[in-house]
């Protein structure tokens, strides 16, 4: 048996806990996101740009959920499969493609939602005397586009096209070229977990994407706070407190999502690529375990998003409430 294979040994966390967690996340995520998509597509008549962003976010979430069974079976059976077996290739290709493509799409869409929420604030204040000429021009020529449903629809389609156009060739290259160059005997091995040169470069670019998304959200929140302070020193904003509170809540929710789910992953990934080059099997196993746990944490956001939608969109919350209220009323009447 190859040295690289024997060096990588899955712990109970990888072989037992992660498969169970991925299956549970898949069940919760498929149910919640399918219900959310049904509401967005059939129950909400007049769709705003936020609804379009959230609908595409749900699509990305469902794609992540579709990868979870592959990830689960990989961690459960990967140490028993042969490296060149069909099931190893299929799980590796579909799991990697679905997981990473949809994660990057989700990140970009969350960034656009943050910009859209800030644009809502600027729309409310673009006619105020306290708004600078720069802010009026910035809103008039750029920000307001993020609130236009047509622009939101086209932007989301472009995002899917660009991300898939990058991820698919990298995944195919890794599966066809890089994955066949190693001498590993088992599916769960060093090369599968670490990736080769091209896939590592792609991983670092992906980490940069996460940093970019986080920067966009932080910038939106900082701009919001700065704008709010300026407005408060110049005029009364009591009549607009609800709008400001709503925008602040949305930006905070997105910030928390990125901090909890994606920030640990993005911080650890460069460290992982630097430290894994040392010939220390115990340290390598710890690094791989940590990477897999943080990847699972990042993908968990896709399953919890339907709860987040209740905080991001009042129409979705109201529609869901009415749906369950009517359902309960009909159920009570049938027993009346």
UniProtKB/Swiss-Prot annotation:
Origin: domain of life: Eukaryota
Entry GO terms, CC: plasma membrane
Give the way it sits in the membrane: Multi-pass membrane protein
Extract one GO BP annotation from the record. Answer: response to food
List where in the cell it is found: Cell membrane
Main localisation, per the record?
Answer: membrane
Keywords, ordered alphabetically: Cell membrane, G-protein coupled receptor, Glycoprotein, Membrane, Receptor, Transducer, Transmembrane, Transmembrane helix
Which regions face the Extracellular side of the membrane?
Answer: 1-11, 77-92, 178-197, 273-336
List of glycosylated residues: 3-4
Give TM regions.
12-32, 56-76, 93-115, 157-177, 198-218, 252-272
Topology Cytoplasmic: residue spans: 33-55, 116-156, 219-251
Matches recorded under PROSITE patterns? G_PROTEIN_RECEP_F1_2
Q: Which GO molecular function entries does the Swiss-Prot or TrEMBL record give?
A: G protein-coupled receptor activity
Q: What does this protein do?
A: Orphan receptor.
Family per record: Belongs to the G-protein coupled receptor 1 family.
Query: What PANTHER family does its record include?
Result: G-PROTEIN COUPLED RECEPTOR 82-RELATED
Q: What is this protein called?
A: Probable G-protein coupled receptor 82
Query: Which gene is this protein's source?
Result: GPR82
